[in-house]
């Protein structure tokens, strides 16, 4: 194909998402495996679909950590991180530390509040 890999990856995610309910979970996992790794441009979307496929298979022990990894990614949309944090928690993976780090004031915040 003459399209850049990024567009082909996006097309794959959209196809898997559209066909998710009728696709065997293991096939979803296999198709998205190269994209469902932290640091990959499509990790958020591919990781969420992969984790949901694991939930569908009853493998919550594999889904929870993926949701937790998504929740830790500051470069992903807040809605996806929040949803992933909730899913991880529901699956027994503690993400409170992840949220606490995000809400902790930085050194500049502490300095700014002293002047008020």
Report each predicted region and the residues it spans.
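Soluble extracytoplasmic domains of inner/organellar membrane proteins
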Residues: 1-106, 114-116
